[in-house]
Swiss-Prot record:
It is found in: Cytoplasm. Pfam families: DHDPS (PF00701). The lineage of its organism: Bacteria, Bacillati, Bacillota, Bacilli, Bacillales. The keyword Transmembrane helix does not apply. It comes from Listeria monocytogenes serovar 1/2a (strain ATCC BAA-679 / EGD-e). The record marks T46, Y110 as: Part of a proton relay during catalysis. The keyword Amino-acid biosynthesis applies. One of its GO terms (molecular function) is 4-hydroxy-tetrahydrodipicolinate synthase activity. It catalyses: L-aspartate 4-semialdehyde + pyruvate = (2S,4S)-4-hydroxy-2,3,4,5-tetrahydrodipicolinate + H2O + H(+). CDD domains: DHDPS. This is 4-hydroxy-tetrahydrodipicolinate synthase. It comes from the Bacteria.
C-alpha cells in the first residue's frame, strides 16, 4: 500500500482564546500542507497533541480534515492507546467516518508490555480493523521498543501495511527492511534520519519538518530516487539545523511557533506543554532564516 513519500504528522490547530479545536484553522492548515509537498497527513498523532485531545475533539478533527482534504492526500488517523479494547473500539468508529486510508497505532505506553504482549496487541487491532494498520514504534515516549523480530512477525499479517520507526536505531531498521516484503512500508519517524533510512531501502518519512519545508523534503527524496545522492545529501545537510531546531523544546511547540509566525494560524500548545519563550523563538527563527542564505 503506497501512502506516499512525505507524510506530515500534522499539528492540531487550537483557537487561542477558546482553547478549542478550530475548524477554520484546520481548513487553512490542510490546504497549506497539501500545496507544500505533503503526500499524506497523520492526524492526532504525537505532533497533533493526541494526549490532550478528547475523544470528541479527535472525531471533530478527523471529520474536518476529511472534508477539507477531499481525496487529495492520503489520511492516517492516530487511534492507538495503551488499552487494546479502547484502541479497537476507536479504530472501528473512525473507519465509519469514511475518507481515512489507514490508522497509526502507537506502541502501548506506561503499562510496559513485553514482546508477546506487543504482538498480541497489534494483531488484535489489525484483525478487528477495517482500515490498514501502520505500527508506530517510539520507545522514547512509550518506554518499550518493538523489537525488529516482532515487527517482522507483525508484517506478515495481511492488514498491517507499514511501520513508523522512531527508535533511531538504523541497524534495527535495516533488519526490518531486509526481512519484510517489498510492499511493507518503512517510514522514518525522525526527519534527520530520512536520508539514511532511504539509503537502506526505506519508503519515506512521517515528518514534522514538512510543515515548514515540505517541498524541500520532497526534493531531497526525489533527488535520492533519481540517483543524485550528492544532491540529496546536500539538501539533507541544509535542512538538518531546522530538523534539530524543531525539537529544541518539546514537539510541537517549535513547529506551531514557526507556522504562526508565517501566518498559518494554529494557536498555542496545550498544557502540560508550553509555548516557546522569546529567546527560544528568536533562535528558531534565526535557524529558519539561515536556510535561505
Amino acid at each position: 500500500m503506497d501512502l506516499g513519500k512525505v507524510i506530515t504528522a500534522m499539528v492540531t490547530p487550537i483557537h487561542p482564546e477558546k482553547d478549542k479545536v478550530c475548524k477554520k484553522r484546520i481548513h487553512h492548515l490542510v490546504n497549506h500542507l497539501i500545496k507544500n509537498g505533503s503526500d499524506g497527513l497523520v492526524i492526532a498523532g504525537t505532533t497533533g497533541e493526541s494526549p490532550t485531545l478528547s475523544h470528541d475533539e479527535k472525531i471533530k478533527l478527523f471529520r474536518q480534515v476529511i472534508e477539507t482534504n477531499d481525496g487529495r492526500a492520503k489520511l492516517i488517523a492516530g487511534t492507538g492507546s495503551n488499552n487494546t479494547a479502547e484502541t479497537i473500539a476507536f479504530t472501528k468508529e473512525v473507519a465509519t467516518l469514511g475518507g481515512m486510508d489507514a490508522v497509526l497505532i502507537v506502541a502501548p505506553y506506561y503499562n510496559k508490555p513485553n514482546q508477546d504482549g506487543l504482538y498480541a496487541h497489534f494483531a488484535a487491532v489489525a484483525e478487528a480493523s477495517d482500515l490498514p494498520v501502520v505500527i508506530y514504534n517510539i520507545p522514547g515516549r512509550s518506554v518499550v521498543n518493538i523489537e525488529p523480530e516482532t515487527i517482522i512477525r507483525l508484517a506478515k499479517l495481511p492488514n498491517i501495511v507499514g511501520v513508523k520507526e522512531s527508535s533511531g536505531n538504523l541497524d534495527n531498521i535495516s533488519k526490518i527492511i531486509a526481512e519484510t516484503s517489498d510492499d511493507f512500508q518503512v517510514y522514518s519517524g525522525d526527519d534527520s534520519l530520512t536520508l539514511p533510512i532511504l539509503a537502506v531501502g526505506g519508503n519515506g518519512v512521517i515528518s514534522v519538518a514538512s510543515h515548514i519545508v515540505g517541498n524541500e523534503m520532497q526534493e531531497m527524496i526525489q533527488a535520492f530516487e533519481r540517483g543524485e545522492v550528492q544532491k540529496a545529501a546536500q539538501i539533507h545537510r541544509e535542512l538538518l539545523p531546522l530538523m534539530n531546531g524543531l525539537f529544541s523544546v518539546p514537539n510541537p511547540a517549535p513547529t506551531k511557533y514557526l507556522l504562526n509566525q508565517q501566518g498559518i494560524s494554529v494557536g498555542p500548545v496545550r498544557l502540560p506543554l508550553v509555548d516557546l519563550n522569546a529567546e527560544q523563538g528568536t533562535k528558531l527563527q534565526a535557524i529558519l532564516e539561515g536556510l535561505s542564505k
